[in-house]
Amino acid sequence: MGLETEKADVQLFMDDDSYSRHSSVDYADPDKFVDPGSDRDPHRLNSHLKVGFEDVIAEPVSTHSFDKVWICSHALFEMSKYVIYKFLTVFLAIPLAFAAGILFATLSCLHIWIIMPFVKTCLMVLPSVQTIWKSVTDVVIAPLCTSIGRSFSSVSLQLSHD
């Protein structure tokens, strides 16, 4: 990228400092289009989805395409990503938000009214079950394992070579 060497009606100068590295569309006056107070991802849940042109397409130093091709492909990449995302959100955002709302409402209701009462009941009953289980193991399982261990400890093997 850089200064186009061919003569043209319009020239594009791109310095590394002034070149935008983010993946959104640059407006001439961004304050008109973006409300600075509305952060739609305040918890940074989708910070991994910031994919720029350089993250997807990269030309090594040894193989560079023409500057116009590079600039046009960059512009087409950004515009197609922007337009397709807007198009998909128009048709998918409302139905998927509705489905996600139903799903989370159902899961919340199940968690609040079924799962947590069941867990709390189990935690209340567990000390009693623990006492009963300890008694059963002391009375039945421990003597059984002790007698089996003593029986096997008295077994001896002798090997002879004939």
Curated annotation (Swiss-Prot):
PROSITE patterns: CAVEOLIN (PS01210). GO terms for molecular function: D1 dopamine receptor binding; molecular adaptor activity; protein heterodimerization activity; protein homodimerization activity; protein kinase binding; protein-macromolecule adaptor activity; scaffold protein binding. Expressed in aortic endothelial cells. Residues 1-86, 108-162 are cytoplasmic. Keywords: Cell membrane, Cytoplasm, Golgi apparatus, Membrane, Nucleus, Phosphoprotein. Phosphorylated on serine and tyrosine residues. CAV1 promotes phosphorylation on Ser-23 which then targets the complex to the plasma membrane, lipid rafts and caveolae. Phosphorylation on both Tyr-19 and Tyr-27 is required for insulin-induced 'Ser-727' phosphorylation of STAT3 and its activation. Phosphorylation on Tyr-19 is required for insulin-induced phosphorylation of MAPK1 and DNA binding of STAT3. Tyrosine phosphorylation is induced by both EGF and insulin. Residues 87-107 dip into the membrane without crossing it. It is found in: Nucleus; Cytoplasm; Golgi apparatus membrane; Cell membrane. The modification Phosphoserine is found at residues 20, 23. The modification Phosphotyrosine is found at residues 19, 27. GO terms for biological process: basement membrane organization; caveola assembly; cell differentiation; endoplasmic reticulum organization; endothelial cell proliferation; insulin receptor signaling pathway; mitochondrion organization; negative regulation of endothelial cell proliferation. Coiled coil: none annotated. It is a peripheral membrane protein. Its main location: nucleus. Transmembrane segments: none annotated. It comes from the Eukaryota. GO terms for cellular component: acrosomal membrane; caveola; caveolar macromolecular signaling complex; cytoplasmic vesicle; focal adhesion; Golgi apparatus; Golgi membrane; nucleus. May act as a scaffolding protein within caveolar membranes. Interacts directly with G-protein alpha subunits and can functionally regulate their activity. Acts as an accessory protein in conjunction with CAV1 in targeting to lipid rafts and driving caveolae formation. Positive regulator of cellular mitogenesis of the MAPK signaling pathway. Required for the insulin-stimulated nuclear translocation and activation of MAPK1 and STAT3, and the subsequent regulation of cell cycle progression. Belongs to the caveolin family. Monomer or homodimer. Interacts with CAV1; the interaction forms a stable heterooligomeric complex that is required for targeting to lipid rafts and for caveolae formation. Tyrosine phosphorylated forms do not form heterooligomers with the Tyr-19-phosphorylated form existing as a monomer or dimer, and the Tyr-27-form as a monomer only. Interacts (tyrosine phosphorylated form) with the SH2 domain-containing proteins, RASA1, NCK1 and SRC. Interacts (tyrosine phosphorylated form) with INSR, the interaction (Tyr-27-phosphorylated form) is increased on insulin stimulation. This is Caveolin-2. It comes from Bos taurus (Bovine). The gene is CAV2.
